[in-house]
Amino acid sequence: MDFRLNDEQELFVDGVRELMASENWEAYFAQCDRESKYPERFVKALADMEIDNLLIPEEHGGLNAGFVTVAAIWMELGRLGAPTYVLYQLPGGFNTVLREGTQEQIDKIMAFRGTGKQMWNSAITEPGAGSDVGSLQTTYTRKNGKVYLNGSKCFITSSAYTPYIVVMSRDAASPDKPIFTEWFVDMSKPGIKVTKLEKLGLRMDSCCEITFDNVELEEKDMFGREGNGFNRVKEEFDHERFLVALTNYGTAMCAFEDAARYANQRVQFGETIGRFQLIQEKFAHMAIKLNSMRNMLYETAWKSDNGLITSGDAAMCKYFCANAAFEVVDSAMQVLGGVGIAGEHRIARFWRDLRVDRVSGGSDEMQILTLGRAVLKQYR
């Protein structure tokens, strides 16, 4: 595989470097993390570079650049300290609506292009249905030409401020044979209650519990086809897990470089700590993990661009990168010592963020189960 970037990709990566050097973004990110605030100004700056157009088809005014280009940009953003986890909806969110939505839904979401604002997300997880998605209890009921949504969702990302949520629910009229359908819900409707939850990490993107009490919808609010909810989100899960893995790599690379610079200037016992063999061992292991992550990510991106990605690929990528990246950040924190745990160094934020990613977007355990099944299926 040729790892050299083409001219278009180089332009994007150069643009990212210029943006990150244009001001002290770290101070802004630290403030947003403390205040659990979405970094809209930063995302708007990326939108001005057309980052939100990367995967949109050319017939809709997009760049159709592909996931290899997304990978190159996300890796560089992460390496330079950007919280790329707030960008998960940018590369794929528009495409999903273009593919599944009605024209009215498409118009509502495409109006957010170029704004940097949060626009929509999926609501799937419930108090009694996390990894066991088939146990969802939120229902939709048809009555007098209307559709009524009832139930609760929890740990829903971006839901504090997004104007629209796509809600997975089951048909109340079919209790014995579950029919799962998604609904495009305007969050300003009566009967919706949103409760913000505090998180250990990933604090720049909200996490909420949402309750729906007889929320009135129209048939036109259906998202995609009736009964196709699971099939639709399966593809979304695969791409989400790939993007989580990209974020993990970028964050780990940033921590690695911070620790390397520190090791080359911190003096103890009359010499820089980077000359100590135990410190060198840490960097050797970190470098091996980072190189392995990078290779896996580019391979997965290439597979996605060529229609070859499987759930097993996404699970492997997500599991390996989430764990390897956390180990890299943990080792980098050990190198930084007191600076990393008692000061205001960004490594503490990275450590919190990456620990969350071993649960969010699919737990470690579910990735292993998915991957194990996928591997054995190849030999039946």
UniProtKB/Swiss-Prot annotation:
Its EC number is 1.3.8.13. Pathway: Amine and polyamine metabolism; carnitine metabolism. GO terms for molecular function: acyl-CoA dehydrogenase activity; flavin adenine dinucleotide binding. Its cofactor is FAD. It comes from the Bacteria. Coiled coil: none annotated. CDD domains: ACAD. It is found in: Cytoplasm. One of its GO terms (biological process) is carnitine metabolic process. GO terms for cellular component: cytoplasm. Keywords: Cytoplasm, FAD, Flavoprotein, Oxidoreductase. It is an enzyme of class 1 (oxidoreductase). It catalyses: 4-(trimethylamino)butanoyl-CoA + oxidized [electron-transfer flavoprotein] + H(+) = crotonobetainyl-CoA + reduced [electron-transfer flavoprotein]. Catalyzes the reduction of crotonobetainyl-CoA to gamma-butyrobetainyl-CoA. Belongs to the acyl-CoA dehydrogenase family. Homotetramer. This is Crotonobetainyl-CoA reductase. It comes from Proteus mirabilis (strain HI4320). The gene is caiA.
